[in-house]
Curated annotation (Swiss-Prot):
List of residues binding S-adenosyl-L-methionine: 31, 33, 58, 79, 107, 122
Family that this chain belongs to: Belongs to the class I-like SAM-binding methyltransferase superfamily. rRNA adenine N(6)-methyltransferase family.
CDD domains linked to this entry: AdoMet_MTases
Keyword annotations: Methyltransferase, RNA-binding, rRNA processing, S-adenosyl-L-methionine, Transferase
NCBIfam families, per database record: ksgA (TIGR00755)
GO (cellular component) term, any one: mitotic spindle
Name recorded for this polypeptide: Dimethyladenosine transferase
Gene Ontology biological process: maturation of SSU-rRNA from tricistronic rRNA transcript (SSU-rRNA, 5.8S rRNA, LSU-rRNA); rRNA methylation
The protein's role, per its UniProt record: Specifically dimethylates two adjacent adenosines in the loop of a conserved hairpin near the 3'-end of 18S rRNA in the 40S particle.
Enzyme Commission number(s): 2.1.1.183
Family annotation (InterPro entries): KsgA/Erm (IPR001737), rRNA_Ade_Mease_Trfase_CS (IPR020596), rRNA_Ade_methylase_Trfase_N (IPR020598), rRNA_adenine_dimethylase (IPR011530), SAM-dependent_MTases_sf (IPR029063)
Pfam families recorded: RrnaAD (PF00398)
């Protein structure tokens, strides 16, 4: 990362927070970003506009918040720890930034989110995946999310078919958004330091979103990534999967007033779809959106759904 200039008033604010004594709560995954250069770099990468409303998840003591308040129209900061919420409120009290800040005390995963343009988060690692999917299902979709994650999680988000870290998370997120790794952040940039290195990614939800039900896409991926290096054909030979496919098919037939043939054989149905797509010997770890969409469409054509 190149050298970044930091405004003096922010540096003073950071010094103030460094002198604040907190007993950090491990249950909340609290690791405060203390490096002003990194904080400024993250805000710069967000490309905020003066008209933007920003959702910040886990603001901590507000080192990112005060910088975003200089650029955006409003910042909605969602924080679980009342002490942190009080600290961030105190930092802007009596300043022009006070009117631009809304602090929401609670769990962001369980909170109905208001409209926002951009999300910025030094994400508590234990909510990484739930937060990503909550943001991707937000409507109207935000323009972008700039999110700090554990390094390995971030690399899974951007992994491509054939990469060692490519997984269901990769395929799922990349269907709904464009994802880019933008910054590495060492653990010594936090207080207290986490056990692992971190990375920042930029997620831009596709607009309009794909004409596809999330539950259907996710349902198929859960099957083919059961063992990502096994063949897709082998994944569909699992007894629990065979039973699920048959139950879903019979439900679809009932809903569409179609009779199930007396000699119906779900294994033959599955084999026929896999052969039609030429994916029986393929492995999910090597397949991309084109292959998975083809498979999902073929199953839908014969009345098999996954939601």
């Amino acid at each position: 990362m190149g050298k970044i200039r930091v405004r003096n008033n922010n540096a003073a604010s950071d010094a103030e927070v460094r002198n604040t004594v907190f007993k950090f709560n491990k249950d909340f995954g609290q690791h405060i970003l203390k490096n002003p250069l990194v904080a400024q770099g993250i805000v710069d990468k967000a490309d905020l506009k003066q008209s933007d409303t920003v959702l910040e998840v886990g603001p901590g003591t507000g080192n990112l918040t005060v910088r975003m308040l200089e650029k955006a129209r409003k910042v909605i900061a969602v924080e679980m720890d009342p002490r942190m919420a009080a600290e961030i409120t105190k930092r802007v009290q009596g300043t022009p930034k006070e009117k631009k800040l809304q602090v929401v005390l609670g769990d962001v995963i369980k909170t109905d989110l208001p409209y926002f343009d951009v999300c910025v988060s030094n994400t508590p690692y234990q909510i990484s995946s739930p937060l990503v999917f909550k943001l991707l299902q937000q409507r109207p979709a935000p323009r972008a999310a700039i999110l700090m994650f554990q390094r390995e999680f971030a690399l899974r988000l951007v992994a491509r078919p054939g990469d060692p870290l490519y997984c269901r998370l990769s395929a799922n997120v990349q269907m709904w958004a464009h994802v880019k790794h933008i910054m590495k952040v060492g653990k010594n940039n936090f207080r207290p330091p986490p056990l692992v290195e971190s990375s920042v990614v930029r997620i831009e939800p596709k607009n309009p979103p794909p004409p596809l039900a999330f539950e259907e896409w996710d349902g198929l991926l859960r099957i083919v990534f059961l063992r990502k290096n096994k063949t897709i054909g082998a994944c569909f030979k699992t007894s629990s999967i065979i039973e699920m496919v048959e139950n879903n098919y019979r439900t679809w037939c009932s809903q569409n007033e179609r009779m199930v043939e007396e000699d119906f054989d779900v294994k033959s149905l599955i084999d026929g779809v896999l052969q039609q797509c030429n994916l029986q010997d393929a492995r999910a770890s090597k397949c991309g959106q084109t292959e998975f969409l083809s498979l999902l469409h073929a199953f839908h054509q014969v009345g098999v759904h996954f939601a």
